């Protein structure tokens, strides 16, 4: 007789409580995806460079039109809170100090991908679409020859 093991999925609230309790170290790079706490890939120099270039372009947009977010959490559902590379958000007077943005507040979301293309394309982008984010760019960094 075999027993099927059940995974314990976490909510965003539980995830935040774990963080506040110090379960994650200051340098831990994790995000909550579909109830699972996943370690994020290390940021390569090419990835960081691409994000910086995007910031340089988007920084020119006046803040009364959009707030620029970089690797900040977006609460998609009760069990999913990814940290996309770049987002443009609807302006808010408090700059989202009281709560992380939700899908209806996202104007544009960009994921830069080099080592996690399959996961970003097959898991993250569909999650963004299901949550109602209207504009998502998956920026795939090609390997140079």
Tell where the protein language model's regions lie, with residue ranges.
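Gly/Pro/Ser/Thr-rich low-complexity, intrinsically disordered segments predominantly at protein N-termini
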Residues: 1-145
